[in-house]
Amino acid sequence: MREKITVARAGADAVDDLRPLFLALHRHHRSLVELPLVADDEAWRARKATYLEWFDEGRALLFVASAQDTPVGYALVVWHEGADDTFPLAPRYAELYTLSVAEEVRGAGVGGRLLDAVDDALADEGDPALVIAVMAGNADALRFYARRGVVPGEVLLYRFPRRAGADARPA
């Protein structure tokens, strides 16, 4: 894809257009981990509802990268209020909840431009802390964020309920 790519701030009205990019990211996550993930349609319904709720609450910040009016990437940030009890995040901090870039433009700087837009918006808000979660096994994402000065702070572990007749504990 060689078209000019633009990055612009968007609102709740753009959320429906994010479905293909979210599902591509969700499927990518499925390829990284051997853990149960929510089915695609259910995952999108839940994610869309979450995004729209955050917009309704005035807590969402969305940037969309587009080529010829077609979204090829997006970054969605959610604001959190209240101090963290472990890290000095201040009373208000941001979480990059989703960064997704279409496979056909990966490596072309789209993710960097989206994160630049996020960083500029955060600078306008007094440069609050930014928290980012990365799916286990996503070494490319870890390298990308490390180049941007983001460092690991904690590891999130899951234990899923045992299914009938199955033992979830390792042997």
Residue ranges and their predicted role:
Residues 1-16, 24, 165-171:
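Conserved N-terminal entry element of GNAT/NAT acetyltransferase domains
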Residues 27-50:
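Conserved GNAT-fold acetyl-CoA-binding loop/helix
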Residues 98-101, 107-120, 147:
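Conserved acetyl-CoA-binding loop-helix of GNAT-fold acetyltransferases
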Residues 87-103, 158:
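Conserved acetyl-CoA binding element of GNAT-fold acetyltransferases
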Residues 145-155:
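Conserved acetyl-CoA-binding loop of GNAT-fold acetyltransferases
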Residues 103-106, 118, 131-141, 158-163:
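Conserved beta-strand-loop-alpha-helix junction that forms the acyl-donor binding cleft
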Residues 64, 70-79, 95, 100:
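Conserved beta-strand in the GNAT
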Residues 49-64, 95:
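A short helix-loop-beta-strand connector motif used in the catalytic cores of GNAT acetyltransferases and
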